[in-house]
């Protein structure tokens, strides 16, 4: 059996879910999401996304790499599944251009060319249906000039969420993702450091978090793990950061 047929049988013909999937679950958004107890400082943004979902519309979730855009989308998709919200979901990982991305993701495509399969995907998103249709497009990294297929998104009748480092997409409302509050950043580091910090070490961490380069969730996760497994103690960790990260900052 072909993978597309298997996924179709599991997710569209079974009664185990209140969502129907127009695409394979081969997108980053379907990787296991961070548990709520380890998801720090994004409660308001996640609530905003839930409101956007119910309000419908087209949204560009914009921010620098590693700031947490994809994880926010994972949390939203996970919430949709857990709450058994009835809808049709298309989740697409952006690769090369939108046509190629659709061609690799959508189920039940019969066209021989990428162009034909792309327009089949557009048709599936445009179909009238009693359930809400939602497209999640993750890590779109081109402008409309670089990828003209993107211009077709604004005319679709479905709800769309696009994560990107780009700050503008025609027809979309931009929702900027910035660094979490300092208290949340501290928790991200400590959650990955896996050692209890002394008051002095907490003060040191607080000083580091004043610098913009360390106000980055993915960076803090990596530093926390590095501090645990490689540096061994806080003195060495702080020394390495100061000596080796100044050029990056």
Where are the model-predicted features located?
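Winged-helix-like regulatory helical subdomains adjacent to P-loop NTPase cores
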Residues: 36, 43, 65, 78, ...
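Post-nucleotide-binding-loop coupling segment downstream of the phosphate-binding loop, primarily
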Residues: 38, 44, 48-52, 58-130
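A short helix-loop-helix "switch/interaction" segment in the helical subdomain of ASCE P-loop NTPases
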Residues: 204-219
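Short beta-strand segments
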Residues: 62-63, 90-93, 136-139, 162-164, ...
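A conserved switch/coupling segment of P-loop NTPase cores
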Residues: 51-54, 74-86, 118-196, 204
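Conserved adenine-nucleotide phosphate-binding loops and their immediately adjacent elements
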Residues: 3, 7-51, 62
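Loop-to-helix "switch" segment enriched in basic
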Residues: 219-249
């Amino acid at each position: 059996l072909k993978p597309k047929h298997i996924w179709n049988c599991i997710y569209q013909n079974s009664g185990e879910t209140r969502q129907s999937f127009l695409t394979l679950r081969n997108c980053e958004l379907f990787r296991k999401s961070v548990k709520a107890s380890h998801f720090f400082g994004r409660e308001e943004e996640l609530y905003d996304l839930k409101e956007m979902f119910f309000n419908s519309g087209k949204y560009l979730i914009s921010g620098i790499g590693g700031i947490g855009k994809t994880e926010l989308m994972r949390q939203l998709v996970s919430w949709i599944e857990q709450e058994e919200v009835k809808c049709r979901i298309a989740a697409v990982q952006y690769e090369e251009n939108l046509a190629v991305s659709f061609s690799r993701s959508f189920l039940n495509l019969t066209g021989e060319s990428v162009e034909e399969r792309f327009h089949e995907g557009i048709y599936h998103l445009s179909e009238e249906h009693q359930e809400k249709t939602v497209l999640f497009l993750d890590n779109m990294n081109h402008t409309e000039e670089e990828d003209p297929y993107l211009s077709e998104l604004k005319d679709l009748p479905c709800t769309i969420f696009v994560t990107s480092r780009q700050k503008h997409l025609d027809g979309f409302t931009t929702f900027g993702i910035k660094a979490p509050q300092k208290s949340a950043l501290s928790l991200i580091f400590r959650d990955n450091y896996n050692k209890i910090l002394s008051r002095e070490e907490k003060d040191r961490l607080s000083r580091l978090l004043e610098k913009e380069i360390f106000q980055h969730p993915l960076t803090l996760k990596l530093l926390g793990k590095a501090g645990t497994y490689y540096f061994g103690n806080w003195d060495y960790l702080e020394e390495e950061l100061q000596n080796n990260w100044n050029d990056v900052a």
